[in-house]
């Protein structure tokens, strides 16, 4: 008889964290893989005049004098890699029933697939971080293996990055009498287009909702804005749709990434982002720089997964996924980022 029930075995799952690529799915829907190491912005439809401001980073400092505007760019290259250690196939996997042990061949397949999932997750976190930073700041620092850090600046207007201070701080307002609607409408005027969605982090949402006027105006009913609801529904455990505030959807994002074994939130505390679900975010990718990929005629691709064995005494087996991601906004001023206080 088994030592564990089915429920106990199902519970023996890998540790979860709240990773949910909301910004990628909501704002970055176009994908452009290139057959060249560089990404050419002029080859993306509608971006003929777009250029990035590129600045090397030396010892943590952005060197503006060495930067410049460019319409072609070399993305950072990422390639998370794992070894499939033969010793791992001899040990019981965490979810194996001790009374019904699997054979090493099965464990090897399981380990390979788990490695691939971990590698895909590692790359997806890089992409989401680029997407979030592009929306929040209009720029981000790009890093990769054997790649000097570079700041990618999309040219966000300074007026679109707002920090509340002094008399504008919501935390100092009377929660029973003050109405933050006028503030939001004023912030929205800085956007280059119409604002139809606001994304909060949990603390920012708590501050916003603390106003009596907000609780009275927030419409939590469904059905009146079908297009918006379609865009924001079923977005996962790390995303919560709170309702409509006038003609604007309110969403709370608690997505996380892991850095050096520590879980961190993608959105800083007390963040509010105003945007539009039709904003044109671009997932661009440089070519895969791998001889095996070239032999398989796989050059323009967002991913290149591989599993191989090196001969020797002993032979060793590895898994790896390669990618050269560069998340861009066609118009960084479609978003307004507000640091609440």
Where are these regions (language model features)?
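Short alpha-helical segments and helix-capping/turn motifs at coil-helix boundaries
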Residues: 25, 182-185, 305
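Assembly/oligomerization interface modules of large self-assembling protein complexes
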Residues: 30-98
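Acidic/histidine-enriched, beta-strand-rich ligand/metal-binding domains
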Residues: 170-198, 203-211, 215-219, 225-230, ...
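Sequence/fold signature of self-assembling virion shell proteins
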Residues: 215-341
């Amino acid at each position: 008889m088994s030592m564990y029930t089915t429920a106990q075995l199902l519970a023996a799952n890998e540790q979860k964290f709240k990773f949910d690529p909301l910004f990628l799915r909501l704002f970055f829907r176009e994908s452009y893989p290139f057959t060249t190491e560089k990404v050419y912005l002029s080859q993306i439809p509608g971006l003929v005049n777009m250029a990035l401001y590129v600045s090397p980073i030396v010892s943590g400092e952005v060197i503006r004098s060495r930067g410049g505007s460019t319409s072609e760019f070399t993305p950072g290259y990422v390639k998370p890699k794992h070894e499939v250690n033969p010793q791992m196939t001899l040990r019981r996997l965490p979810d194996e029933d001790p009374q019904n042990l699997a054979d090493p061949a099965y464990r090897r397949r399981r380990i390979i697939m788990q490695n691939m999932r971990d590698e895909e997750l590692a790359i997806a976190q890089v992409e989401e971080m680029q997407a979030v930073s592009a929306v929040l700041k209009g720029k981000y620092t790009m890093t990769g293996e054997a790649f000097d850090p570079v700041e990618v600046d999309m040219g966000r207007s300074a007026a679109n990055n707002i920090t509340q201070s002094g008399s504008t701080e919501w935390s100092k307002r009377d929660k029973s009498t003050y109405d933050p609607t006028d503030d939001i409408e004023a912030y929205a005027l800085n956007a280059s287009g119409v604002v139809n969605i606001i994304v909060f982090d949990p603390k920012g949402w708590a501050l916003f909702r603390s106003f009596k006027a907000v609780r009275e105006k927030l419409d939590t009913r469904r059905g009146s804005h079908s297009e918006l609801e379609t865009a924001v529904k079923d977005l996962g455990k790390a995303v919560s749709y709170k309702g409509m505030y006038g003609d604007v959807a309110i969403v709370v994002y608690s997505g996380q990434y892991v850095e050096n074994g520590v879980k961190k939130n993608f959105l800083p505390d007390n963040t509010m982002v105003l945007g539009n679900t039709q904003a044109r975010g671009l997932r661009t990718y440089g070519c895969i720089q791998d001889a095996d990929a070239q032999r398989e005629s796989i050059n323009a691709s967002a991913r290149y997964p591989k599993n191989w064995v090196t001969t020797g005494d002993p032979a060793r087996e590895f898994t790896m996924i390669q990618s050269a991601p560069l998340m861009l906004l066609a118009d960084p001023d479609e978003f307004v980022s507000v640091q609440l206080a």
